Amino acid sequence: MSDSTPVRAPRHPGIYLLPNLFTTGAMFAGFYAIVVSIGGRFTDAAIAVFVAALLDGMDGRVARLTNTQSEFGVQYDSLSDLVSFGLAPSLVMYNWSLSSLREYGPLWGKVGWAAAFIYAVSAALRLARFNTQVAVIDKRYFQGLPSPAAAAVCMSFVWSMDNFGVSGPALDMFTPVTAVVVGLLMVSRFRYYSFKSLPMGDKVPFLWIIVGVLILVPFFVDPPRVLLVVFSLYLLSGPIVTLWGLTTHRKRQRRGVI
């Protein structure tokens, strides 16, 4: 090869289009939630975060069904989750309620944005921890409240209150507590059931159909309040399951000693 022969740069590998379109859609929904919340459309913002959660749940399944999993997709999905379930809920809550704390004085104003930041950084830490432990943790459980579920708790709360006609400023003392508690649950060590071991492709007892109908009918009648109840129960399940497991383990240890 002569000195004058041009050297071709190595070609960069492409990315899979279909699953990453779902991921992009989820990120756009989170971004949209932030934008419309600035304009005071809080119900639309909350619904957008739920749309993001739906798309986020589909991108991984699409990748597995089409055999298009990639490390790029994993990292891109994580960044999308940070926008949709970290930044979007924190800023929606800030625009809806937390920003009104500044009316009590400069210090209270800082409490408002600090609560929003604690939620956002907790989501970031939760996602980073998940990415580093995904190969070693028990697939049946999540460690800490998953960020989509945390976002669902907060956004169903905003959605329900907005439907009731309750303004964010009327709850400006409750919202920061909610944001901080939910944020801390994301980085906690409480175990939350992942539902990954459910037999989705297998036959199930007929009773499961009845249970599904009993859940779906109220959901279509009053979506925000049903979502708030369901995800609040899931939020509480982590501490309850973890403490129950510790209590049972200690009882077994005592029996073994005796």
Q: Can you name each region flagged by the protein language model?
A:
Residues 1-7, 139-258:
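C-terminal membrane-associated helical module and adjoining short loops/tails
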Residues 18-23, 50, 65-127, 157:
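Multi-pass membrane catalytic core of lipid/isoprenoid biosynthesis enzymes
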Residues 32-47, 89-114, 157-174, 220-225:
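Helix-coil boundary and interhelical linker segments in multi-pass alpha-helical membrane proteins
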Residues 4-14, 38-44, 69, 104-113, ...:
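Short juxtamembrane and helix-loop transition motifs at transmembrane-helix boundaries
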Residues 22-25, 45-49, 112-122, 150, ...:
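Hydrophobic alpha-helical transmembrane segments of polytopic
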Residues 1-57, 241, 258:
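Topogenic membrane-insertion module of multi-pass membrane proteins
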Residues 113-153:
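Hydrophobic, well-structured mid-protein blocks that either form specific transmembrane helices
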Residues 28, 54, 58, 62, ...:
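Active-site His/Glu-centered metal-binding helix of metallohydrolases
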